[in-house]
């Protein structure tokens, strides 16, 4: 069972600045969100046997806070779980970017400018790394902390466009639960936030 978690809130999330692969830490709210999610998993008696996280600070911090108090012997830091690279636009305000490129984050097949990683390339690396993780972990409870754009690109692939990119945003510290069987991913929970008290 794969629990795919978007990192906790950062100040750039709050101020609607495009983070991409900039190494931004969690805000105080983000820290509390991650702790709360960890307590939720413990209350549900979910014990992770494997933990994978993007190498970006906000994801790594989230993974550490979620698993505090759990007996986790090893974290696997995986750069392919990173957020999409937004090139020259990283750090800009999202409202300004939408005026410049309305489809920058919604549609596949759009020619990218400003050095932005294409949605197709991001999706390929996410599908590849998640498939590898699924094969290695063989159904055991696995925590994977990544980023909203990356997770959505994966979900777009899995659901043939019914979920994911262009269909909505993932909340900070929401989790999406995937089952891997017969060489295929199956979505069992999506953008789950019902236990969130910290916003």
Residue ranges and their predicted role:
Residues 1-3:
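Extreme N-terminal starter segment of soluble prokaryotic enzymes
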Residues 147:
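Short basic (Lys/Arg) and small-residue
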Residues 10, 150-151:
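Short active-site segment of divalent metal-dependent hydrolases/proteases
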Residues 44-47, 133-141:
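Glycine-rich phosphate-binding loop signature in dinucleotide/nucleotide-binding domains
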